[in-house]
A protein has these predicted regions:
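Membrane-interface extramembranous regions
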Residues: 1-118
Length: 118
């Protein structure tokens, strides 16, 4: 695993942990609605996808997994913009930056194969 892959894993874990923190925080506050569950599911989604991306036994579907992770991340950013942008704080903006950089790195890995081993 090269530096690019390590960066991708770190960014995915960072955004996953942010979503886990938000989900737990919302549950602890007793806030109802779907948001706590969505945050927790987002955590699970990031962890499962980034694990599947680099799991040796799933290498044959790595390209598809990479694209799914990119779309998943983009969808997360878009839905945040549509649902919660008016309630954004510094943590939200940091998380969106992490997610955008994650997408950029995944695109780099997809289109420049030599980066996969660098």
């Amino acid at each position: 695993m090269g530096l690019l892959q390590i960066a991708i894993v770190l960014l995915a874990v960072i955004t996953a942990v942010i979503h886990l923190d938000l989900g737990v925080e919302f549950l602890m506050r007793g806030l109802g609605g779907p948001l706590p569950l969505l945050f927790l599911l987002n955590f699970v989604g990031y962890i499962v996808l980034v694990t599947a991306l680099y799991l040796p036994s799933l290498q044959r579907i790595q390209s598809g997994t990479r694209w799914i992770l990119m779309v998943y991340t983009a969808l997360t950013v878009i839905l945040w913009y549509l649902i919660a942008r008016n309630y954004a704080d510094l943590e939200a903006y940091v998380d969106k930056l992490v997610e955008v950089v994650l997408i950029i790195l995944l695109l780099g890995e997809a289109f420049w194969p030599r980066l996969r081993t660098a």
